[in-house]
């Protein structure tokens, strides 16, 4: 019988005053009882509107029905038939803008907690001692190279391996996972408990992962074809090049890109005493930006011991691009929002250290091409926010290394690789997807592109083999 309660089961969490000083996971996950109760809120709609909002087409009502029955193993099999990274998606996907936004229960009340249920199923499976052994699919004799090991690449690799392809991932860093390991903090996405397990599952399927391999430097795409015998290449190298404000003072000591700041903490473990990664522990931090990365950077700064952390954003709260959940978590941990303020300069002392950031107050004008109201400067409203560190989190773009070393690879005006709706680039046999094409976007959209790329590569190689 359906549970007609209007609200979701709340997600158990660490107390904000405790968690803001540790890197343990904030959301603690559903119990079995909570998961079954939440699953019974699903109406099992025949037309499955929720599935249309999922970039990897998870059979949502089907897996939720199995959760409601207490058959968590069957639920896991349903999810992983289309999603190679369920424990990741259950934690970081913006479900409120995707599957849950389509949920019929959300018309009157809150939608079903689809993401929370997906996470529960994945965590239940990982915790099982008697998991069935992963059996690698038989090889079909065709080789594919994948550049990068973020969500797009991991998804593409998993799908291709299921089809029988011999897949090798080339990762520039010393650890696989891409943005999942260097960009998203431990307290949102545990690295050993979740990411490493998902990567290891792919290895058990037969995916080979080569780390410390910078394509475009150690070897080129042409060499992957000519010297290593790959029949297709998928570029999923992400968007790791930080964007800056281009204002006075950006070269002062204490100014970080969010990319560098988070990489030091997440990948290089600067927050742990048993690592010697250098990082500053500022007392007052200004973070520029309003997306999920800005929320992550601000919350990390608080956990490193900052007394005050401010997020400066040139629009209002309704225009913040970050997930509502991330904004609420930041606020509850004491992060202060300086909305309708735009940075115009960073100030420093005679030794070149940051002492403050100069902000100009803004008003909201007419909507821009994306429908968000444009920020309009208020004359004579400049003021200085005292701080000893500034973290710039206004976006990233694809690294130019691959495109600069690959002849005939067309790119967009913003530096992304030009690819059609099937992931095909201007080079025969070269496909691309995720942030390397679109610029910085969500994990699940990158995964959707990886699935598309795998399907296209399969069709391409089969057409060449006829």
Tell where the protein language model's regions lie, with residue ranges.
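Beta1-alpha1 glycine-rich phosphate/pyrophosphate-binding loop at the start
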Residues: 3-28, 57-69, 78-80, 107-115, ...
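Ferredoxin-type iron-sulfur electron-transfer modules in oxidoreductases and energy-metabolism complexes
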Residues: 19-37, 59-91, 108-138, 265-266, ...
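Local cysteine-cluster metal-coordination motifs and their immediate loop/turn environment
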Residues: 40-62, 84-107
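Feature captures the FAD/FMN-dependent oxidoreductase FAD-binding
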Residues: 74, 138, 143-147, 199-247, ...
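Helix-enriched interaction subdomains in cytosolic or periplasmic regions
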Residues: 93-124, 239, 243-251
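Glycine-rich dinucleotide-binding loop and its adjacent helix/turn
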Residues: 121-138, 195, 200-217, 242-304, ...
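FAD-site-proximal beta/loop scaffold in flavoenzymes
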Residues: 251-282, 367-440
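A conserved FAD-binding loop/helix module that cradles the flavin
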Residues: 436-464
């Amino acid at each position: 019988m359906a549970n007609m309660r209007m609200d979701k089961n709340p997600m158990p969490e660490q107390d904000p005053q405790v968690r803001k000083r540790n890197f343990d996971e904030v959301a603690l996950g559903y119990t079995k009882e909570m998961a079954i109760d939440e699953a019974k809120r699903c109406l099992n709609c025949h037309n499955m509107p929720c599935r249309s909002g999922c970039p990897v087409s998870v059979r949502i009502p089907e897996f939720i029905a199995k959760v409601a029955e207490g058959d968590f193993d069957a639920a896991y099999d349903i999810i992983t038939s289309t999603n190679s990274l369920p424990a990741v998606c259950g934690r970081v996907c913006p479900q409120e803008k995707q599957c849950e936004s389509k949920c019929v229960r959300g018309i009157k009340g809150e939608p079903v907690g689809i993401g929370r249920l997906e996470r529960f199923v994945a965590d239940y499976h990982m915790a099982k001692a008697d998991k069935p052994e992963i059996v690698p699919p038989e090889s079909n004799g065709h080789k594919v190279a994948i550049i990068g090991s973020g969500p797009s690449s991991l998804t593409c690799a998993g799908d291709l391996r299921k089809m029988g392809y011999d897949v090798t991932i080339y990762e520039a860093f010393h650890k696989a996972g891409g943005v999942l390991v260097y960009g998203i903090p431990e307290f949102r996405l545990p690295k050993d408990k979740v990411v490493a397990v998902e990567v290891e599952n792919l290895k058990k399927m037969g995916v080979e992962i080569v780390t410390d391999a910078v394509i475009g430097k150690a070897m080129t795409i042409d060499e992957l074809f000519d010297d290593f015998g790959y029949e297709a290449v998928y570029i999923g190298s992400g968007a790791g090049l930080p964007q800056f404000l281009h204002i006075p003072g950006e070269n002062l000591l204490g100014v970080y890109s969010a990319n560098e700041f988070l990489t030091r903490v997440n990948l290089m473990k600067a927050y742990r005493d048993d690592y010697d990664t250098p990082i500053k522990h500022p007392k007052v931090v200004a973070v520029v930006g309003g997306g999920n990365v800005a929320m992550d950077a601000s919350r990390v700064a608080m956990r490193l011991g900052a007394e005050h952390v401010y997020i400066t954003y040139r629009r209002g709260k309704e225009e913040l691009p970050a997930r509502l959940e991330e904004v609420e978590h930041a606020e509850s941990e004491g992060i202060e929002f300086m909305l309708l303020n735009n940075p115009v300069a960073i100030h420093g002392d005679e030794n070149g250290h940051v002492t403050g950031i100069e902000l100009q107050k803004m008003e909201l004008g007419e909507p821009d091409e994306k429908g968000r109201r444009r920020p309009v400067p208020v004359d004579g409203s400049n003021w200085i926010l005292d701080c000893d560190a500034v973290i710039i989190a206004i976006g990233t773009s694809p690294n130019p290394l691959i495109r600069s070393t690959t002849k005939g690879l067309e790119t967009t005006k913003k530096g992304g690789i030009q690819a059609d709706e099937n992931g095909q680039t201007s080079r025969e046999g070269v496909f691309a997807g995720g942030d390397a094409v679109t610029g910085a976007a969500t994990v699940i959209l990158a995964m959707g592109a990886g699935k598309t790329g795998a399907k296209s590569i399969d069709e391409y190689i089969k057409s060449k083999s006829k």
